[in-house]
């Protein structure tokens, strides 16, 4: 409840309005925490069976056709004041083939590469890569907007038509990054993925990537 309260407070403090906020939770009833924000933001609360993918799919199923862009957020994320307005600005200038744009997680160290890690096949010079070894290079704290091969499922804005066309199937993995890669990496082969440098968020979780 504490984490989602922080997230909703950061949405309340954004420098632009959002059209709809859908919270899907499992376990403890947190409707009292959620609905106290209803006076300030267009928030809705739903419950589901446990599982990040189940929660995300239920939220997506509730969307109507008027919603072109959908942000999928983990509950420990906190928006910077201009994160959404910068994201909208970025989307207004990308190619039509763009499927998703990630927020820039700025409180986690960004990509660091050295020749030895590269020799072992566990790193690459560029951020946002998926390597043959299965390792990924970081998409956090980028210093400029980048095109990438994977995106964080809990901090990305997708075109709704992409989410509808490619449902996020449940997988048995205790590692959230694995779920993110399985969903987003194939999209990078057909569409364009970015991380927007100016669209900044912070997260409480420590482990976001394999580096």
What label would you give each PLM region?
Residues 9-18:
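Short, acidic, metal-binding catalytic loop of nucleotide-sugar glycosyltransferases
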Residues 23-34, 77:
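A conserved acidic beta->alpha catalytic loop
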Residues 57-69:
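Active-site nucleotide-sugar/metal-binding loop of Leloir-type enzymes
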Residues 67-78:
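Short beta-strand-to-loop acidic/aromatic patch adjacent to the donor-nucleotide binding site
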Residues 82-122:
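Conserved donor NDP-sugar-binding/catalytic core segment of glycosyltransferases
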Residues 121-148:
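Short, flexible, basic/aromatic active-site loop/helix in glycosyltransferases
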Residues 153, 174-182:
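Acidic donor-binding loop at a coil-to-helix junction in glycosyltransferase catalytic cores
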Residues 189-211:
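Active-site-adjacent helix/loop segment of glycosyltransferases
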């Amino acid at each position: 409840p504490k984490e989602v309260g922080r997230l909703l407070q950061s949405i309340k403090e954004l420098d632009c309005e959002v059209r709809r906020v859908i919270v899907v939770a499992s376990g403890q009833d947190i409707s009292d925490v959620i609905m106290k924000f209803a006076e300030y933001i267009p928030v809705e609360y739903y419950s589901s069976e446990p599982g990040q993918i189940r929660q995300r799919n239920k939220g997506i199923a509730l969307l109507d056709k008027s919603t072109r862009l959908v942000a999928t957020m983990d509950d420990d994320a906190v928006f910077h004041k201009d994160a959404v307005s910068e994201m909208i600005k970025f989307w207004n200038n990308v190619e039509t083939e763009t499927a998703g744009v990630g927020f820039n997680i700025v409180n986690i160290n960004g990509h660091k590469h050295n020749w030895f890690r590269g020799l072992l096949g566990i790193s690459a010079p560029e951020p946002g890569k998926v390597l043959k070894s299965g390792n990924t290079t970081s998409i956090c704290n980028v210093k400029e907007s980048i095109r990438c091969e994977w995106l964080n499922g809990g901090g990305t804005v997708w075109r709704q038509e992409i989410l509808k066309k490619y449902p996020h199937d449940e997988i048995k993995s205790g590692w959230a990054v694995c779920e993110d890669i399985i969903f987003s990496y194939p999209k990078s082969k057909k569409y364009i993925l970015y991380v927007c440098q100016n669209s900044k968020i912070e997260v409480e979780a420590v482990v976001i990537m394999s580096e």
